[in-house]
Design a protein with these regions (language model features):
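Short histidine/acidic/glycine/proline-rich micro-motifs that form metal-
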Residues: 1-3, 134-135
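ATPase catalytic-site recognition across NTP-hydrolyzing enzymes
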Residues: 136-194
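Short, conserved catalytic or adaptor-binding loops enriched in Gly and charged residues
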Residues: 26, 34-38, 118-124, 183-186
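Catalytic micro-motifs at enzyme active sites that drive phosphoryl/nucleotidyl and oxygen chemistry
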Residues: 53-56, 115-118, 181-185
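Walker B catalytic acidic pair
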Residues: 70-72
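Inter-Walker segment of RecA-like/P-loop motor cores
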Residues: 3-65, 166
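ASCE P-loop NTPase helicase motor core
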Residues: 74-149
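The start of beta-strands in P-loop NTPase/AAA+ ATPase cores
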Residues: 65-66, 191
């Protein structure tokens, strides 16, 4: 849960302050949740360590119909995502509401199941949105300079982390190579013998 405290929980607390509505929320760390005081609706935070524990999550009031999975790229098994998506949110909800699972992530590998599922083979119930550092209103000049430096020094990482393009940002052994005829001059006195 420490990862939530330092990421999603902190982001939503920051948004409450930024929007000037923090007085409408009660935020607790144990259990980690946010309660919207006018309606008593809750935002609950859970880790993805055990998908079966999450699948049994429910709320005492209202409906559990929105799920946000931050850093969804860390879910390596699509079957685990399916278990969660098919069980939370669940149940009948009023007609003026809808069920939604939102996944946020950086597209670190074009071979990840997220690309195939949500970008290559979309259906009418899927909407995808891509953002990048150029349109991120929350970055300051220092942040932008980091991406500009990345653009010059690590183009592949810039394409993924900066521009939000699918790729493989890290881990290849040879980054600067091409296929072609070697440009090695051979003198006539050196003959290859087979």
């Amino acid at each position: 849960m420490n990862t939530h405290r330092d990421s999603t929980f902190a982001q939503l607390k920051w948004a409450q302050e930024k929007l000037g509505v923090s007085h409408l929320w009660q935020n607790t760390v144990s259990p980690m949740e946010m309660t919207y005081l006018p309606t008593k609706q809750k935002i609950i935070f859970r880790g993805f360590d055990d998908v079966l524990k999450i699948a049994s999550t429910t709320v005492p009031k209202g409906y559990l119909n929105f799920v946000w999975i931050e850093e969804a790229f860390e879910i390596s098994d699509e079957a685990d995502f399916d278990k969660l998506d098919l069980s939370v949110p669940r149940g009948k909800i009023p007609e003026d509401l809808f069920k939604q699972t939102t996944v946020t992530f950086n597209p670190w590998s074009e071979n990840h199941w997220l690309k195939k599922r949500f970008f290559d083979n979309t259906d009418e119930n899927t909407a995808t949105f891509s953002t990048n550092y150029l349109i991120n209103e929350f970055l300051d000049e220092t942040d932008r300079k980091i991406f500009e430096g990345m653009k010059k020094n690590n183009r592949r990482k810039y394409e993924v982390a900066g521009l939000g393009n699918w790729g493989i940002a890290e881990g290849l052994v040879y980054e600067n190579w091409s296929v072609g005829r070697p440009e090695i001059p051979f003198d006539e006195e050196y003959k290859w013998k087979c």
